[in-house]
Amino acid sequence: MKIITVTLAPNQAVLTCYLQDQSPKMPNAAIRPAMLVVPGGGYQYCSDREGEPVALAYMAQGFNAFVLRYTADATTPIDKALQDGAAAMDYLRANAAELEIDPQQIAAVGFSAGGHLVASLGTLLPQRPCVGLCRNAGRNVDRRWPPGARPARAG
């Protein structure tokens, strides 16, 4: 396994990349599906238990996995986290060959606030993942948008 850490603009979010080792005995597995893991934490922090352990579980299923530590603290509006999610998706697609992933097979899984972020990525921005899985998606997060900045709901 190879681990790469990338800092994403504009908010200095951190994307940790967990990449499978290539095996000459498995030439058809050179390009893998990707799973973007978005931990919860109430938009106040990113939970460690919903990051690397989840990424490793997806790696065991054949994915290359990526954990997004988005901008999160008590004073930051969630639009910054949404920017971080978009930056992560842009990075994955732009660097798909280097990361040995299929840009048409990028899924995202999020927990709690991370689930809300994945759902928001899937409905509000063009940088959406191919598939989004949300677990215990956050409630009462509308209050975190700055005045006048909350995007319109899709559909």
List the model feature ranges, each with a label.
Residues 29, 47-66:
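Short amphipathic alpha-helix adjacent to the substrate-entry channel of hydrolases
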Residues 34, 59-69, 107:
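A fold-wide structural signal in alpha/beta-hydrolase
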Residues 47-48, 68-103:
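Catalytic nucleophile-loop/oxyanion-hole region of alpha/beta-hydrolase
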Residues 31-40:
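Short beta-strand element of the alpha/beta-hydrolase
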Residues 42, 70-74, 140:
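Alpha/beta-hydrolase active-site loop signature
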Residues 45-49, 53, 76-83, 108, ...:
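Residues at secondary-structure transition points
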Residues 1-30:
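N-terminal cap/lid segment of alpha/beta-hydrolase-fold proteins
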Residues 87-155:
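Primarily recognizes the serine-hydrolase "nucleophile elbow" in alpha/beta-hydrolase
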